[in-house]
């Protein structure tokens, strides 16, 4: 690091599928890294006393809790934290502008107050879904077995459906937070709405079809889909795809609720280089620390510091719509919509989230395939998940 030339950083890359296994092996061998990226399992490491309580390090680093967005802390108790999200992402609607113009339909709204209802969204997806003869999904002669362009594709993990569930008054957990809540009426209906895009309206590909299709950016650029709902991390690939793309608010027209999310950097108590680890942390999480870090915050990531959402100059620094990964409407649809309507992300808040969500994701495959209704599948999986449910870290439903 040019800012700290006396600090030498040894990097280690671990594939995501092996990450936790490898990290646990290093810890068991007394060879834990000084600093590590981490997912929701970090809070258990905090409870086990393996990592520093970030609140205890704030003064040393010249930081304050108020420097960061209030919904972005990975806390394992009210006074103990693994730290704030390193770099934010959020769920968003991305689209191919040309598909909309060719279909003669209005572009997705970028302001929350103008957001489509779910029914309006489905109608738009029908108009944008085309068979090989050019008929859209609203046409009575539409051939659902020969589709060349889908109206929408979506990620099937929690980050996609939870904004809709939270906005509808549902939750990942039930109201008493002692069991899964995805089988509750409001939550199950949202999951069913997504499944119906595939199996009823035929505006989204089946799981088998989707597996044979490329990434979000490539699918949008190739006009295999007109819209895609998933994480903002896709913006870097969209920037490089050559696609004429845009972003809009999610199709939620009442009680718009969403979240920032992301992993974080943790510092292990076993480190012999605490001061150097703190400096590395500050360098990696400062959007203005270097050209490379700045580039990441202007394409792949979003900041976690509050000033980058409240100071107009700071907003423009990373979210100016003159930047290639920040299309027209980005500041309204992504920055403002998320900042104004964010709650704590489900994976940050729910205890034992990794273990629970592995079971939920497997059960949802039956929903996406149309073999079971959302209510059926989520009611069945409760028998496996509820022994893992221990509430939330905040004490509030998520």
Language-model features and meaning:
Residues 2-68, 83, 98-104, 108, ...:
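Extracytoplasmic "Venus flytrap"/periplasmic binding protein-like
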Residues 13-22, 113-120, 206-221:
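Short helix-initiation/N-cap motifs at beta->coil->alpha
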Residues 37-42, 213, 230-235:
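Beta->alpha turn/N-cap motifs
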Residues 91-95, 100, 165, 265-267:
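Short glycine- and hydrophobic/aromatic-rich loop-to-beta-strand nucleating segment
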